[in-house]
């Protein structure tokens, strides 16, 4: 009897322990994929008000999803080749001061975001920034460097249609011409670039020695992947049918680098799909449609930027596009709105996660500095755009 009792107690203990481990993993996954969880909940809640029907099929912009997938997949393949590290290190090793190296890293992130999307640029170049600073004993500058790299990725990637996910979506949704897109984004891009470069002057001119790092690149694959990247860009610019481009890129990577297909940010794609459902349902609710249409009539840039502070810029772009035809105003608003709160851009969460990974006890100090710089950028950019738009 005692044996059976002990066995029952042990069994209950193991079950309780297993449940605890499972719930811990669920909580950890939810924290790591917070935006996906929120978007799925939002889609489910709105589905109670607008039950699923055939109209749901019209919510999803398959071209945007295909283009985003292709860009992420090809960039993943290029990262697997370490080509970005090789190019970045070559630039970094030409500078000899803290200011020079940190400015180079910020500029690399800036140009990287124009070609690779903002989140991919940060995933690629933040670790390089930590490597350089930690290997030269300059870890104290990590927070400021990461914040300026984050600003560069969020605010300078706005100049290209594929510089961030919301641009890719709006460029496709409104069927914008490249010329219209470029001229709409040029003023905030120039101002953002100037502000970021001015902030880089804060870094000291202290001399340092950056250790050499051996990085080998397969030149043959680099050429092939470069061609695939050009194909992905051509898809975004509507020079190539997206079905054809998707087929070629998937088949090429299937044979050359399946790992790149596995490392695609499927959570981001799922987030897009969920927010397509959420925004589509909201657009079919008459009261919501009237509310957003009325708000946006008072200033698309301001309202969209403020919306980003609460639900992030990608969801804001998808949601608000249903209620306004002011494509340029919405473009500027959701890009400028990437500054401000930590949740204003998905890329900012990547930066915070990377920083706390290297400096586990520095989260509060980082958030304080991040908020000060980011809100300053947001205020200046909104004031400038308000002045330019009369």
What are these regions (language model features)?
Residues 137-205, 210-214, 351-382:
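Membrane-core helix-loop-helix motifs of multi-pass transport proteins
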Residues 25-55, 65-82, 201-205, 231-259, ...:
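Structural signal for alpha-helical transmembrane segments and their membrane-water exit/capping regions
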Residues 23, 89, 202-226, 258-262:
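Flexible interhelical linker loops that connect adjacent transmembrane helices
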Residues 182-193, 302-390:
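C-terminal transmembrane helix pair
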Residues 61-64, 93-106, 135-146, 219-223, ...:
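Membrane-interfacial loop-to-helix junctions in multi-pass transporters
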Residues 105-107, 111-155, 318-332, 360-364, ...:
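Hydrophobic transmembrane alpha-helices that form the pore/transport pathway of multi-pass ion
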Residues 59, 81, 85-88, 228-325:
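Transmembrane helical segments that form the transport core of multi-pass membrane transport proteins
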Residues 26-31, 54-64, 176-187, 214-218, ...:
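Interfacial loop-to-helix junctions that mark the boundaries of transmembrane helices
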């Amino acid at each position: 009897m005692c044996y059976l009792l002990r066995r029952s107690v042990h069994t209950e203990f193991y079950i309780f322990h297993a449940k605890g481990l499972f719930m811990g993993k669920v909580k950890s996954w939810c924290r790591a994929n917070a935006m996906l969880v929120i978007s799925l909940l939002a889609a489910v809640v709105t589905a109670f008000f607008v039950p699923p029907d055939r109209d749901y099929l019209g919510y999803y912009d398959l071209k945007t999803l295909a283009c985003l997938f292709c860009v992420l997949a090809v960039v993943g393949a290029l990262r697997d080749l370490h080509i970005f590290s090789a190019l970045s290190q070559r630039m970094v090793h030409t500078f000899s001061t803290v200011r020079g190296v940190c400015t180079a890293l910020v500029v690399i992130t800036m140009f990287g975001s124009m070609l690779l999307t903002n989140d991919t640029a940060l995933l690629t170049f933040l670790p390089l920034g930590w490597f350089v600073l930690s290997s030269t004993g300059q870890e104290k500058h990590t927070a400021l460097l990461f914040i300026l790299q984050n600003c560069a990725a969020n605010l300078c990637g706005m100049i290209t249609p594929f510089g961030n996910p919301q641009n890719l979506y709006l460029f496709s949704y409104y069927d914008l011409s490249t010329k219209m897109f470029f001229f709409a984004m040029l003023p905030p891009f120039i101002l953002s670039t100037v502000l970021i470069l001015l902030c880089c002057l804060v870094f000291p001119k202290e001399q340092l020695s950056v250790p050499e790092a051996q990085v080998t690149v397969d030149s043959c694959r680099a050429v092939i992947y470069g061609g695939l990247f050009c194909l992905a860009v051509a898809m975004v610019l509507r020079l190539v049918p997206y079905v054809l481009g998707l087929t070629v890129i998937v088949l090429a990577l299937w044979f050359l680098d399946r790992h790149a297909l596995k490392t695609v940010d499927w959570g981001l794609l799922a987030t897009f799909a969920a927010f397509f459902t959420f925004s589509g349902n909201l657009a079919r609710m008459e009261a919501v449609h009237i509310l957003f249409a009325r708000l946006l009539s008072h200033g698309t840039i301001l309202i969209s930027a403020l919306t980003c502070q609460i639900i992030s810029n990608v969801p804001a772009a998808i949601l608000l596009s249903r209620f306004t035809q002011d494509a340029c105003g919405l473009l500027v608003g959701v890009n400028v709105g990437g500054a401000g709160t930590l949740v204003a851009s998905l890329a900012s969460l990547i930066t915070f996660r990377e920083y706390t990974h290297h400096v586990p006890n520095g989260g509060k100090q980082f958030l304080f500095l991040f908020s000060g710089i980011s809100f300053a950028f947001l205020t200046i950019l909104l004031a400038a755009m308000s002045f330019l738009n009369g």
